[in-house]
Amino acid sequence: MNIIETLEKEQLRTDIPDFRPGDTVRVHVKVVEGNRERIQIFEGVVIGRRGRGINETFTVRRVSYGVAVERIFPLHSPRLERIEVVRHGKVRRAKLYYLRERVGKAARIKEER
């Protein structure tokens, strides 16, 4: 194992729950406003994960007041307070980019039993 891999391994978080694309997650993010720090919750559907190790990211999509918002979160970021899995969705794709074209009920994902 080289030096870079050793340093990256120390930075990896161990408190990350098991979640996949299609799952609905609630991400608690630390937001700094001026000299204050608060927790902001972003809840939505995971539409993709990419990368490995310290560079791994995941994309969460939600529709708020008719406007779709997608945020990309680094999985091992110290800004993430915690990730809660709200429900597990049943999908057959690794990337759910097709949901961007779907509106309303067509954008729903079946719940895994």
Curated annotation (Swiss-Prot):
Listed NCBIfam families: rplS_bact
GO terms under biological process: translation
Similarity-based family: Belongs to the bacterial ribosomal protein bL19 family.
GO molecular function: structural constituent of ribosome
Pfam families listed in its UniProt record: Ribosomal_L19
One Gene Ontology CC term in the entry: cytosolic large ribosomal subunit
Highest classification ranks of the organism: Bacteria, Bacillati, Bacillota, Clostridia, Moorellales
Protein species of origin: Moorella thermoacetica (strain ATCC 39073 / JCM 9320)
Function statement: This protein is located at the 30S-50S ribosomal subunit interface and may play a role in the structure and function of the aminoacyl-tRNA binding site.
Name of the molecule in the record: Large ribosomal subunit protein bL19
Keywords per UniProt: Ribonucleoprotein, Ribosomal protein
Matches recorded under InterPro entries: Ribosomal_bL19, Ribosomal_bL19_CS, Ribosomal_bL19_sf, Translation_prot_SH3-like_sf
Stored SUPFAM superfamilies: Translation proteins SH3-like domain
